Amino acid sequence: MCGGAKMSVTNTKWVLKERPEGLVKNENFELIKEEVRDIQDGEVLIENQYLSFDPTQRMWLTDLPGYLPPVQIDEVVRSGGIGKIIESKNGNFSEGDLVSGMIGWQTHHIPSENDLKTMRKVPDVLPIPTMLNIFGSTGITAYFGLLDVGNPQPGETVVVSGAAGATGAMVCQIAKIKGCHVIGIAGGDEKCSWLKECGVDDVIDYKNSNVAEELTKLAKDGIDIYFDNVGGPILESVLFLININARIICCGSISNYTGEQMPVGPRNLTMLIVRRAKMQGFLVLDYYGRAGEAIDDISKWAMEGKIKHREDIQEGIENCPETLNRLFTGQNQGKQMLKI
């Protein structure tokens, strides 16, 4: 900060007060204002700019086991995002640096020592929403999930559920770049039209058609790769149609995130044996060390006009709960985020 008297900074934050059931409600949380303490040696103060909203955040609000521990009562709600460093006592970061990482539902953030190690500097060369979308965890998830786990080959049939979401749309487009026939599953005319704009070969509107019947018609030669963002009955429908040596990439299970009990699994997992197929889960956290590979390729494809993207930007820290719900009501159009 500039010399002279230091101005006090007020942080506005959402903390969890009770475990939600179904869609979240404002009363599940408390919006608190508090003065930010002085930073110590080795610390930085971040002014948050944009928050990323992803379906997995809803699962973090339950007490079910996951790849990260549940958000505890009276803790700030966990969320990734991008912010600007406005004060630094750490030699690795300067005032004005843009950084991405877990910053939470709040306007300001002093990361812990461990959290600061995971913060990545963001080049100030593109709009922040673009960086948070295709060059952030969304793009990295799509890239490594499809290419590293799925290993697509030209001519193969790739099915993507949640295809109009931020990750799903990226997966569809990367699969097309790799020469695959792509079938996208989404809900509603607008989202299905968006997928056609992205070059998807065939689109299934799960809200207005029978997914199992449509898959049987469209995937006449079977399914080689399924990128699963939703779980539930759609996964079961796909399993009946997989080819020998098919690869099922388990990225998310949005259909189950608002429940309080673990869902019943697919009844036809024996198809994995019959078809000698691979079903593998993965986490983008495991690939952050290789993020440069994804960013290089995605940058090249974007410059060549092969990648389309769009963002759904809400505004105001007070609207965090409503913004999260948009992912589960189908209101979001593109990558869901919030400008603070």
Give, region by region, the residue ranges found by the protein language model.
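C-terminal hydrophobic helical "lid"/dimerization subdomain
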Residues: 6-9, 285-340
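Glycine-rich beta-strand-centered segment in the early N-terminal region that forms part
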Residues: 35-53, 62-105
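NAD(P)H dinucleotide-binding glycine-rich loop of Rossmann-like/cofactor-binding domains
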Residues: 77-84, 95-162, 306
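N-terminal Rossmann-like NAD(P) cofactor-binding module of classical short-chain dehydrogenase/reductase
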Residues: 100, 159, 204, 226-227
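Short, glycine/polar-rich helix-capping loops at beta-to-alpha or helix-loop-helix junctions
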Residues: 106-107, 187-194, 263-269
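Mid-domain Rossmann-like dinucleotide-binding core that forms the NAD(H)/NADP(H) cofactor-binding site
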Residues: 132-209
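Short amphipathic alpha-helix with an adjacent loop that forms part of the alpha/beta core around
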Residues: 210-221
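Glycine-rich phosphate-binding loop and adjacent beta-alpha segment
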Residues: 233-307, 340
